């Protein structure tokens, strides 16, 4: 049985008597602390497995496409292979087969901490294996070693106008980091395509290492009068270094950041940012260009700005209704929002049909660390009322809260009130998932993405409809 097969079986067995054995098997799948060495062992096995699968089932149909799907943003079309995570409508996201609660239980934590380290999740996403503390420690130190920014990127960030949106700065700086691309250099020198993944791995590791420095510099320049981000401490984990560079020293905020960066990392391959990185990467654009393109998608109001919209709506609600709000007044406000043609931000999801587990774990964090915060109480009250109102309205396929309904409130509580910046945090996190997949896309030799497009007249002719 392959290591990746073990990771797929483990979650189904965690509740059984064999749970301990499976967890031990997954944890001990590889003793090496060097991620590239582990990958070098996994890649040929996965290549062989997929080759055999395609030989046997390559011509097998996996579904039908309707006209509504074509006009509806390709919702429900099974058209991508994405290995690192799968989104179940009822269970929510699973990272390499593991649910968020399982990741919280199994992934290594910082000394004295309770939330999983994002390094551990990245190892899991790349390998399918639950890492050891030693493997996570190696990754923390490796990213610290690779974190320094080239001088031209620092100069660029320092000279951006203050009215340029943080996401525009983030994307531009990532594009400029392409000067450091090992993959672009190797490709120009004619490297064998069997080795593409090795250089994509190096670029991805470098980029993930540098993103907190880029993000922190943007934050300091815009909101802290350009003060220094300080130096990376190789003895600290990735999230701890990030919060230090941002200027936040509260241990609970660092714990929140570990949780935030873990749960926002990946959400299967069809969302805008993940699909964009896959699409651009399929042209053999290097990871810097691919990820920068993904961030331009994440900056869109329909993708990464939702948590900001939640806070704007909550603030307006507080301003209109005052402090303590009765359930009846809350219901009336929600109905007024809906009747005006607007939606309740933070509720509903394109795929999910239950409460987003990413919302649930943030709610649990808030119940433990800030149960009396007025804004959290408001969010908790909405959780009790909004789903019933949406069900009563009868339009929503999913009346339950998603991840965005909670994250902004937590950040505000610890003093990060700059809402325009929140999507940058989302972007730092999303790198873990899409870059883990990008490495595998090159390792598995995925081709240039080129779906067939059709005109409306062509579709009408295809289904036998009259044009006009």
Swiss-Prot record:
Pathway as given in its UniProt record: Carbohydrate metabolism; tricarboxylic acid cycle; isocitrate from oxaloacetate: step 1/2
Q: Which NCBIfam families match?
A: cit_synth_euk, PRK09569.1
Function (record text) = Key enzyme of the Krebs tricarboxylic acid cycle which catalyzes the synthesis of citrate from acetyl coenzyme A and oxaloacetate.
InterPro entries for this protein: Citrate_synth-like_lrg_a-sub (IPR016142), Citrate_synth-like_sm_a-sub (IPR016143), Citrate_synthase (IPR002020), Citrate_synthase_AS (IPR019810), Citrate_synthase_euk (IPR010109), Citrate_synthase_sf (IPR036969)
Q: Which SUPFAM superfamilies match?
A: Citrate synthase
**Catalytic residue list:** 303, 349, 404
Write down the chemical reaction(s) this protein catalyses: oxaloacetate + acetyl-CoA + H2O = citrate + CoA + H(+)
An annotated Gene Ontology molecular function: identical protein binding
Q: Where in the cell is it found?
A: Mitochondrion matrix
Name of the featured protein: Citrate synthase, mitochondrial
Q: Record's Gene Ontology CC terms?
A: mitochondrial matrix
Where along the chain is the transit peptide annotated?
1-30
Query: Additional info?
Result: Citrate synthase is found in nearly all cells capable of oxidative metabolism.
The EC designation for this entry is 2.3.3.1
Gene encoding the protein: cs
